[in-house]
């Protein structure tokens, strides 16, 4: 015998489901702008700026070297890749990995991240669990096993309730991790409201990634430039332009007056 279908009151949609969605979305937007206000500017040294510009110059030479004469290309390549005194060969940078326990700025960034990400999630989640506790909000459109009951029915302990039903507390967490497409559409791709992306970065350690090794970047660029040959793209360009038939008939119109009077 089939179990009777559970019908929800329409007021639950108006006073529980939609408010949780709006509150979660607004908290994410506020968290995004608060993270922008608390974001500290990263200070770059003159050496870091100079190294980045050198890498850009080398990459531009590899991509657009075909538009300059071969002698000019070889001169620039010799400056970067000379075996004896080339820039990429003689330049060695000392890379000191920063320690979060000795760098006050890193500790400050960690504290700001906890304030803008973890604290609002705990406070709003606790408030929603206290305000909307005990409500069944919606049902997923496919059957689930009993293993999903602790995840989708937080705050509701009914053994006879189908695992496809979602409680109010679980509905909040589903919105926290399910509104990333809306945040990307409204706030942009790299926004501070995407809680799932922030948690993934914290779990993988990307939020405290060490700076790139400049020596490895120089070596990779040296190898790429060493494999680049000069392919003159403007060969016979003068003859090609002069050999084209120039149609000048359209420059003169027969209807134009030939005299002033």
Curated annotation (Swiss-Prot):
Residues in compartment: Cytoplasmic: 39-114, 188-261
Tagged with keyword ATP-binding: no
Domain of life assignment: Eukaryota
Segments crossing the lipid bilayer: 15-38, 115-130, 169-187
Chief place where the protein resides: endoplasmic reticulum
Membership in a protein family: Belongs to the EMC3 family.
Function, in words: Part of the endoplasmic reticulum membrane protein complex (EMC) that enables the energy-independent insertion into endoplasmic reticulum membranes of newly synthesized membrane proteins. Preferentially accommodates proteins with transmembrane domains that are weakly hydrophobic or contain destabilizing features such as charged and aromatic residues. Involved in the cotranslational insertion of multi-pass membrane proteins in which stop-transfer membrane-anchor sequences become ER membrane spanning helices.
The protein, known as: ER membrane protein complex subunit 3
Record gene name: emc3
